[in-house]
C-alpha cells in the first residue's frame, strides 16, 4: 500500500502497477483522491482506501510504501512494523526496481546545486544518466529509463527519505555537510546526523563515499564507512578535491582556477568540490568539468540576483530554510545589507545566526512570519538591536526597502521554512521577486531620516 499521494507516492504506485503488483492507495486527506493522476492509477487497477479504521487497513497489504512527507513514527507505520510487515520509502522502492548505478547526494545544504552540477557535467561529457530524487523528480518516475547498467542515476536524497532506507546502496554516496535542520521532525541533532550517515550503511569497499573533510559531524562517523573515501575541502589538501593558491585540484590534477567559477560564495565552492569528486569517479574529463563550472550560475531562489532597482541590489535566497544556509548568504553579500528573516520554525535556535549578523555587513534585520518573536528575543539576547518586526511578508519587504539607502543590498534569506504563508520556498521566492519588480524607490534618504 502506498501511503501519501504526493508526487512521490503517485510515482511509486505507478511503478508498482508496471510490476503487476496489487496496489492500494491511502491518504489522510480525501482531497488527495480527486486528482486526475490518482484517477488514472485507479483506472489501471489501484484500489483507493477510504473511510476505514487503521485496524481495517492493516490486513490489506504486505508492504507499506511511505511518501517522504509521512514520518516513520506515524501510527500506521508503527502498527505495520509491529505486525512484522515491511515499511519502506519511495527511494528504497526505486532502488529495488532499478539496475542503474546510483550517485546519491545528501547534506543539509547544497544538495540541489551539487546534483545539478553533476547532471550538467555528465551531460557535457556525454555520459548517460538520469536526474531524480528530492529535486522534484521522483526516483520511481525514472524506472523505465534506469533499466540498464550503462545509465547512471543521479539522485538528491533528503533526511526524510533516509528514514525509510534499509537495503539502499549507492555506487557513490556524497555527504556535503550536516548542520541543524528539521529538528521538529528528527527531534535531536544526534538522530539527524545518524539519518544522514545511513546513506553509507550498505556500501562496500567497491563503492565510493565522497565526504566533506571540514565538517565535524561527518568526521564523527567517517571511520565506520566501508566504502572508499574520497574527500573534499576548501581549507586543506586532501585525497580528493581541494583548493590551493586559488586553483582547484583533484588529487594532484589541476581542474580549473577558482576565479573562473560562475557560482559565488564559499558554500558553493564546497558544492563544486563535491561535484568534481563525483564526476571524476564517473570518468568525466577535465574539459567537461571546467566548461560547466565556468558557466553554471546556480539554482533559482539561492542567492539569486533579482535586479538593481533604484540604487539597490535585491537578492532572493528563499531556499535558505535553515540558519546555516542563511549564514552562507550573509557571508556572500559583502555590501551593506538589509536582511529579511523569518517563516515557519524548524526547531532551531538563532543565537549563532545573530552572532554572525553582528560581525557581518548587515545593517538592519526585518523579522517576519511565525518565527518573528523567537528571532527577536534571540537577537536582543545576542546584543543585536537593529531588528524590525513585521508579521506580514509583503509589508516586511516594503519595510526593508524603506530602511535601505542607495548602494545597499536587500536580501531575503529567511532561515526558516515557508509553510506559514506559502506552499514552498519557490512560491515565497516568486512572491518576493514580484514585490521587488513592483518597487519604484522610496527608501529613506538624508532628508527623511
Task: Tell me the role of every PLM-derived stretch.
Residues 22-29, 209-213, 340-341, 361-370:
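Short internal beta-strands
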Residues 38-42, 351-408, 444-449:
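C-terminal helical cap/extension that packs against the catalytic core
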Residues 48-60, 91-96, 120-194, 201, ...:
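ATP-dependent carboxylate-amine ligase catalytic core
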Residues 1-89, 93, 447:
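N-terminal leader/targeting and accessory segments in enzymes
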Residues 147-232, 242-244, 256-263, 418-426:
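Flexible active-site lid/hinge loop adjacent to a nucleotide/diphosphate
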Residues 9-19, 128, 258-362:
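Nucleotide phosphate-binding/pyrophosphate-handling subdomain across enzymes
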Residues 27, 51-52, 88-92, 226-243, ...:
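Beta-strand->loop->alpha-helix junctions that form or flank phosphate-binding loops
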Amino acid at each position: 500500500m502506498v501511503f501519501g499521494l504526493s508526487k512521490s507516492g503517485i510515482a511509486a504506485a505507478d511503478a508498482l502497477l508496471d510490476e503487476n503488483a496489487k496496489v492500494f492507495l491511502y491518504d489522510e486527506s480525501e482531497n488527495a483522491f480527486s486528482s486526475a493522476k490518482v484517477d488514472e492509477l485507479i483506472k489501471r487497477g489501484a484500489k483507493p482506501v477510504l473511510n476505514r479504521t487503521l485496524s481495517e487497513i492493516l490486513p490489506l497489504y504486505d508492504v507499506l510504501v511511505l511518501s517522504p512527507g509521512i514520518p516513520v513514527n506515524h501510527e500506521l507505520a508503527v502498527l505495520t512494523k509491529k505486525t512484522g510487515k515491511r515499511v519502506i520509502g519511495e527511494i528504497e522502492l526505486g532502488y529495488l526496481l532499478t539496475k542503474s548505478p546510483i550517485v546519491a547526494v545528501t547534506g543539509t545544504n547544497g544538495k540541489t546545486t551539487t546534483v545539478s552540477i553533476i547532471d550538467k557535467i555528465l551531460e557535457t561529457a556525454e555520459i548517460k544518466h538520469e536526474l531524480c530524487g528530492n529535486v522534484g523528480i521522483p526516483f520511481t518516475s525514472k524506472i523505465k529509463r534506469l533499466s540498464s547498467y550503462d545509465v547512471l542515476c543521479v539522485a538528491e536524497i533528503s533526511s526524510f527519505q533516509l528514514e525509510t532506507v534499509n537495503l539502499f546502496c549507492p555506487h557513490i554516496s556524497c555527504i556535503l555537510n550536516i548542520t541543524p535542520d528539521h529538528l521538529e521532525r528528527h527531534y535531536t541533532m544526534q538522530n539527524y546526523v545518524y539519518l544522514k550517515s545511513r546513506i553509507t550503511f550498505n556500501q562496500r569497499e567497491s563503492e565510493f563515499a565522497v565526504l566533506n573533510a571540514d565538517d565535524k559531524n561527518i568526521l564523527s562517523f567517517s571511520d565506520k564507512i566501508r566504502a572508499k573515501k574520497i574527500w573534499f575541502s576548501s581549507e586543506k589538501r586532501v585525497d580528493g578535491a581541494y583548493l590551493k593558491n586559488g586553483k582547484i585540484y583533484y588529487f594532484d590534477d589541476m581542474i580549473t582556477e577558482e576565479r573562473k567559477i560562475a557560482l559565488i560564495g564559499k558554500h558553493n565552492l564546497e558544492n563544486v568540490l563535491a561535484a568534481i569528486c563525483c564526476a571524476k569517479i564517473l570518468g568525466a574529463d577535465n574539459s567537461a568539468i571546467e566548461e560547466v563550472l565556468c558557466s553554471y550560475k546556480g539554482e533559482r531562489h539561492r542567492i539569486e540576483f533579482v535586479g538593481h532597482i533604484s540604487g539597490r541590489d535585491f537578492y532572493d535566497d528563499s531556499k535558505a530554510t535553515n540558519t546555516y544556509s542563511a549564514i552562507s548568504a550573509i557571508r556572500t553579500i559583502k555590501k551593506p545589507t538589509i536582511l529579511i528573516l523569518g517563516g515557519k520554525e524548524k526547531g532551531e535556535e538563532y543565537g549563532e545566526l545573530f552572532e554572525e549578523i553582528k560581525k557581518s555587513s548587515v545593517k538592519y534585520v526585518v523579522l517576519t512570519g511565525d518565527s518573528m518573536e523567537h528571532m527577536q528575543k534571540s537577537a536582543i539576547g545576542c546584543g543585536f538591536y537593529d531588528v524590525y518586526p513585521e508579521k506580514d511578508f509583503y509589508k516586511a519587504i516594503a519595510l526593508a526597502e524603506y530602511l535601505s539607502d542607495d548602494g545597499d543590498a536587500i536580501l531575503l534569506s529567511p532561515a526558516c521554512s515557508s509553510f506559514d504563508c506559502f506552499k514552498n520556498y519557490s512560491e515565497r521566492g516568486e512572491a518576493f521577486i514580484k514585490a521587488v519588480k513592483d518597487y519604484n524607490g522610496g527608501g529613506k534618504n538624508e532628508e527623511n531620516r
